[in-house]
Amino acid sequence: MTGFVLFAHGSRVETANQAVRDVATQMAARGKHVVEPAFLELGKPDLAGAVERLVAAGAGRIVVIPYFLTLGTHLQRDLPKLVSESAAVHGHVEFEVTPPLDGHPALVEVLLSRAREAVQHSLEAL
C-alpha cells in the first residue's frame, strides 16, 4: 500500500494547523488513499509520527507531499533529513518526496480565481 504525508510547516495558530489536517482528510476522501498530515514544527504529528501511523496501516511506500509554495530551506535541508531518519527506522519502506506547489498550473488558476473574486467584489461595492 502507498501512504501519503501532507507535510506542512506548522503554526502557533491552531486553526491554521487544523486547515492542513482538513486538506489531508479531503485528499484521503477523494483519492481513496491513507493521507496523514505532518508538521515540521508547532503542530502534531511530526513527520516521524505520521510515518509510524502509515507503517502501522500497512504502507510499504510513503509519498511525502510538501504543503509549501516554494523550495526553501525547510524543503532543501530539513525535510530530507527527516525523511532519511524515518527511512533508517523503517528500512523496508520506500520513500518519495514530491516537489512543492510552485510551478504547478493549478496554482496559477487558484491565484487568478482569487484575483477575479477581488475585482468582482470591488465592482459590486460601487
Regions found by a protein language model. Give the residues of each.
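Active-site-proximal alpha-helix that buttresses catalytic centers in soluble enzyme cores
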Residues: 1-126
